[in-house]
Amino acid sequence: LLSRRQRQMCIRDRDTYRTQIQLLSMLDPEVASDIVVSHQLFAEQSGGSFPRWVMANIETGVMQGDPTPILIANAYAFGARNYDPKPIFKIMRKGAEEPGSKSQDVETRPGLKQYLDKGYYNASIQLEYTSADFAIGQFALHAVGDEFASWRYFHFARSWKNLYNPDTGWLQSRNPDGSWKSLGEDFRESTYKNYFWMVPYDIAGLVEIIGGKEKA
């Protein structure tokens, strides 16, 4: 896959999926495509699922969420397309729907079974998962041409609404039985106020659920 191309590793996916991969994909789509294929190869050689933070060819498990599908979907959207999207989409789906999927010894999505079965989990992790699911849906639709799969992942992405507590007006973690955890619990490297806006694909839905523009 990388004959006469460069393997790109030591990519901090969670720190680069928001802006860096988009810029790189516009400026040098071949290098960005190599990054995508390098992630594919790493997954295929390391348990079948994508990593999220690789250092010296080791999946460290640092940070949370499932950032690689977001990175890849953004690379595709911004012009890095020199690869076959179908096997990449297959890897995305494995991590998103098969509890226990791993990259090396690191579980791709901790808490995935509860997330899929109940539609809620720890708040900041779930908000990362829903962003990843929206990205997978976009990749399914535009790169693979699978409209049915895209709507499946868009449905998962909308589960952020299950975190909204109308009594407090904030997004909160929930226990397995559906009860609310303490406001601010389970937010990593941030606060519940910062993470409140972590639905960039559905800002209109967030504004609506809190009561309109005046509330926002």
Residue ranges of each PLM-predicted region?
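Short alpha-helical scaffolding segments that buttress acidic/His motifs in well-ordered protein cores
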Residues: 36-39, 92, 157, 203
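Single conserved hydrophobic/aromatic residue that forms the stacking wall/gate
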Residues: 1-7
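Alpha-helical support elements that line or immediately flank enzyme active sites
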Residues: 15-31, 73-78, 138-144, 197-211
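Glycine-rich phosphate/pyrophosphate-binding loops
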Residues: 27-50
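Catalytic cores of carbohydrate-active enzymes
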Residues: 50-51, 142-216
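Conserved active-site and cofactor/substrate-binding residues in soluble primary-metabolism enzymes
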Residues: 14, 30, 67, 83, ...
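Conserved small/polar residues in nucleotide/adenosyl-binding loops
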Residues: 7-13
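Active-site cavity-forming subdomains of large catalytic enzyme subunits
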Residues: 43-160, 166, 189-190
